[in-house]
């Protein structure tokens, strides 16, 4: 079999839909053994079955709440028991709880920080030792243009996504000597369930700020992730790849 990720193993968090689903699909098409993680068992199993059918490869699903350190650690050990190594991890899971700061509850703040940023710590701290042992690995953390520019009503989301960038740059310096690369992707206005829920007026306002004049597709984020996961980016670490139609 030919492909950029043949015989590689990969975990994609939040892989049941949207960007994560597209990344998992492309990775599998390129020869990787892929496992998607999510918190909805029914949706996750269905997504894994669909991915397996579409790619002709066995894609598995694990029920994991990435905001729970013990669940993450346990599933990493399960994955290693089955596949022996973790070559690529894509931290894509995330939520939004939008509100102006003056109206934002502590719970709305904490839930977004814990899920979007705390999960990065949980997953990376669990996979880093086996990657160091293997002296190889690619960590891809999905940030956002909001983490670069900010967005009104999203102080929690912006803080988490900006934190992911800082985390990734710091970690890249810790583990670079072990041949482990850590990079971020900062998607812009992408066609996902999250953006589909926006009203037309808000969508049009967003599009005014996109020089390419259109919404991005999840598959375009997946192509960026494939590049960062493959040997084509073997001398790239600690970077933020903006895939945003020129918004940043």
From Swiss-Prot:
GO terms for biological process: fatty acid elongation. Belongs to the short-chain dehydrogenases/reductases (SDR) family. Catalyzes the NADPH-dependent reduction of beta-ketoacyl-ACP substrates to beta-hydroxyacyl-ACP products, the first reductive step in the elongation cycle of fatty acid biosynthesis. The keyword NADP applies. This is 3-oxoacyl-[acyl-carrier-protein] reductase FabG. It comes from Chlamydia trachomatis serovar D (strain ATCC VR-885 / DSM 19411 / UW-3/Cx). NADP(+) binds at residues 14-17, 65-66, 92, 157-161, 190. Its EC number is 1.1.1.100. The gene is fabG. It catalyses: a (3R)-hydroxyacyl-[ACP] + NADP(+) = a 3-oxoacyl-[ACP] + NADPH + H(+). The keyword Lipid metabolism applies. Pfam families: adh_short_C2. NCBIfam families: 3oxo_ACP_reduc, PRK05653.1-1, PRK07231.1, PRK12826.1-2. GO terms for molecular function: 3-oxoacyl-[acyl-carrier-protein] reductase (NADPH) activity; NAD binding; NADP binding. Pathway: Lipid metabolism; fatty acid biosynthesis.
């Amino acid at each position: 079999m030919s492909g950029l990720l043949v015989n590689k193993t990969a975990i994609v968090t939040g892989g049941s839909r949207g960007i994560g689903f597209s990344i998992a699909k492309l990775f599998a098409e390129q020869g990787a053994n892929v496992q998607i993680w999510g918190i909805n068992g029914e949706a996750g199993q269905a997504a894994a079955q669909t991915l397996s059918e579409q790619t002709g490869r066995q894609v598995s699903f694990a029920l994991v709440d990435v905001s729970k350190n013990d669940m993450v650690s346990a599933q990493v050990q399960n994955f290693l028991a089955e596949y022996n190594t973790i070559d690529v991890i894509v931290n894509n899971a995330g939520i939004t709880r939008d509100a102006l700061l003056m109206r934002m509850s502590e719970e709305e703040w904490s839930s977004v920080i814990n899920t979007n940023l705390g999960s990065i710590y949980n997953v990376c701290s669990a996979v880093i030792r086996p990657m160091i042992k293997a002296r190889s690995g690619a960590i891809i953390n999905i940030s956002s243009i909001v983490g670069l520019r900010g967005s009104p009503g999203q102080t929690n989301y912006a803080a988490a996504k900006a934190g992911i960038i800082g985390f990734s740059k710091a970690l890249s310096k810790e583990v670079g000597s072990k041949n482990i690369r850590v990079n971020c992707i900062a998607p812009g206005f992408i066609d996902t369930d999250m953006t589909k829920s926006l009203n037309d007026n808000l969508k049009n306002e967003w599009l005014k700020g996109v020089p390419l004049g259109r919404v991005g597709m999840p598959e375009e984020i997946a192509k960026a992730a494939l590049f960062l996961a493959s040997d084509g980016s073997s001398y790239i670490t600690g970077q933020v790849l903006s895939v945003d139609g020129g918004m940043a």
